[in-house]
Amino acid sequence: MIIRSPEPEVKILVDRDPVKTSFEEWARPGHFSRTIAKGPDTTTWIWNLHADAHDFDSHTSDLEEISRKVFSAHFGQLSIIFLWLSGMYFHGARFSNYEAWLSDPTHIGPSAQVVWPIVGQEILNGDVGGGFRGIQITSGFFQLWRASGITSELQLYCTAIGALVFAALMLFAGWFHYHKAAPKLAWFQDVESMLNHHLAGLLGLGSLSWAGHQVHVSLPINQFLNAGVDPKEIPLPHEFILNRDLLAQLYPSFAEGATPFFTLNWSKYADFLTFRGGLDPVTGGLWLTDIAHHHLAIAILFLIAGHMYRTNWGIGHGLKDILEAHKGPFTGQGHKGLYEILTTSWHAQLSLNLAMLGSLTIVVAHHMYSMPPYPYLATDYGTQLSLFTHHMWIGGFLIVGAAAHAAIFMVRDYDPTTRYNDLLDRVLRHRDAIISHLNWACIFLGFHSFGLYIHNDTMSALGRPQDMFSDTAIQLQPVFAQWIQNTHALAPGATAPGATASTSLTWGGGDLVAVGGKVALLPIPLGTADFLVHHIHAFTIHVTVLILLKGVLFARSSRLIPDKANLGFRFPCDGPGRGGTCQVSAWDHVFLGLFWMYNSISVVIFHFSWKMQSDVWGSVSDQGVVTHITGGNFAQSSITINGWLRDFLWAQASQVIQSYGSSLSAYGLFFLGAHFVWAFSLMFLFSGRGYWQELIESIVWAHNKLKVAPATQPRALSIIQGRAVGVTHYLLGGIATTWAFFLARIIAVG
């Protein structure tokens, strides 16, 4: 008789056919809500339909069902992303000058859009070089394609088709995992398993496969391109993968195969896994061999990290234990209870993820110019400016989203009866101290940062330059920042003995790198002007945080409205008969936070745009003399408000204002139109609902007179709807205005 250990029970983690697929139901507007499904009585119906369609919390209170809807929606989102990517690659294949750009990236601009002549719009097709006429693009796709080893438009076609297949696959997966095999709640809450798969699978194997692609395909192809070989002569990717001798000609260590790996003689691989630092002088981008090495190292770290958490085998960390062990001397119960919050409130989970992803996106913005990862990216000033601006805006929106979902968690998911003396409870109990101190910091920063500028404007107006804060009079040098720069500039040979150059040329020390007579990057000097504007950054960021954090900490209750939690996430006022209680909902804090986020990011991208044109970007003569686009005027001009208005906004707007009749005229029209969209927002923000309701009733009266009144009663927008429309147009108008201003300028002079 054989005694067996009991078989481990396999947990069934999916439900089969939980929701039937019904086109009839999908075709009924508002099928997710009993009230909305009845159809419209008033025009408010269409607003409620849009507001609640994706608010899954309002469709059901069953956490499992909500989780499944979110999970399924993620596949829909991925499908849209693949569709978008496919469109980008298709434009590269069908409408672009990619192959021409590849053969001469310093003299030919990237273009992937040719405008059809209908009523004269073909004026927009500017000459981008090499005899190609089209709209210059600034997305950085060409540089990315070159870095990944794409050498022909046929390869772009194939990738575009592949992305379409994946888009279809994702749509199918979204349907399948909601209607056919929907995961149970336990599956969504199994955090250790999720961590293992995401860390080892997505990040670990993802980085490893990218490192493999770089080593076997990108590096050899880029090696040939840098040497000036015609792209059509370069072997195709599969030839490098299948033929080891081909690679061994470029990287001798390939001849030895995996022997050095297993004999621990890893330094043999140093010909394609380097640790140089700095930029490749041919392309002005990071060394691609450094990047391959980086991805290999990252892959190893994440593969290890993906084996740290306890799943089926009973070994490893449990996240609940880690959190509950986290107790400081002053934090009471510490992180006890956080595990339950993060596994039952997807808003809390999303809030943390948005905060971290938003911060990471802003870090990406700063690395794209200081460590330009792709060949010929650094000398494409339009793309550099666009990538920085784009990632700053995205980061700002994500961080505001983090506050929004933190507040929704507080209102909908927070249970005060089970939370006592843990970290969150302690934060909430001393929220008055937090907010009043933060408010003081904002007032201090606001008066002092702005005061320095006002002082300078006044002294300048009175003709007393010797009494101004500037590099040539009263100096306020950013000594801490300069110390950090210096430390990094000295790091190679000290803290990083293998590296030949520092992580970024911007730190100082190194010479400039120029490609095709244009500056790619050089040490960025910091002075009084930067010190002043950095304190404006500190001010605007602190005010944004003040508004958002106050919204979160007072989302459930305040002295003014103790029962705020019962009123929900968004409400206009605390009912009739309680004056002075409007605009206090958590939603209103997000609304106000968006304006200050817009302020913060605007100052950052203005600072970046002017600083780079003044101190970095420009041309290099044969004698090595650098001529910057605005001739280094940042240090002396940006220290007064007047300087910002006169030498940045007005002086640099000349290109967009004078763009009519040229290939940049679309930016002139966008500049005008976006100003109009922005002004349109003020109509919603500075106007009361009653005004519009009265106006509508007069108009309805006229329709009744003529017997053309509709069955659906027109209603003025609610207060919340009006503010939502207002902030949307404010941001859309402001961002599009800035976009047109930046691009017309930098394409003309860059």
UniProtKB/Swiss-Prot annotation:
PANTHER family, alphabetized: OUTER MEMBRANE PROTEIN, OMPA-RELATED, PHOTOSYSTEM I P700 CHLOROPHYLL A APOPROTEIN A1-RELATED
Cofactor binding note: P700 is a chlorophyll a/chlorophyll a' dimer, A0 is one or more chlorophyll a, A1 is one or both phylloquinones and FX is a shared 4Fe-4S iron-sulfur center.
Cellular component, GO annotation: chloroplast thylakoid membrane; photosystem I
Positions that bind phylloquinone: W692
Gene Ontology MF, one: magnesium ion binding
UniProt subunit comment: The PsaA/B heterodimer binds the P700 chlorophyll special pair and subsequent electron acceptors. PSI consists of a core antenna complex that captures photons, and an electron transfer chain that converts photonic excitation into a charge separation. The eukaryotic PSI reaction center is composed of at least 11 subunits.
Top-level taxon of the source organism: Eukaryota
Record keywords: 4Fe-4S, Chlorophyll, Chloroplast, Chromophore, Electron transport, Iron, Iron-sulfur, Magnesium, Membrane, Metal-binding, Oxidoreductase, Photosynthesis, Photosystem I, Plastid, Thylakoid, Transmembrane, Transmembrane helix, Transport
Entry's EC annotation: 1.97.1.12
Record-given protein name: Photosystem I P700 chlorophyll a apoprotein A1
Residues that hold chlorophyll a according to the record: M683, Y691
Function: PsaA and PsaB bind P700, the primary electron donor of photosystem I (PSI), as well as the electron acceptors A0, A1 and FX. PSI is a plastocyanin-ferredoxin oxidoreductase, converting photonic excitation into a charge separation, which transfers an electron from the donor P700 chlorophyll pair to the spectroscopically characterized acceptors A0, A1, FX, FA and FB in turn. Oxidized P700 is reduced on the lumenal side of the thylakoid membrane by plastocyanin.
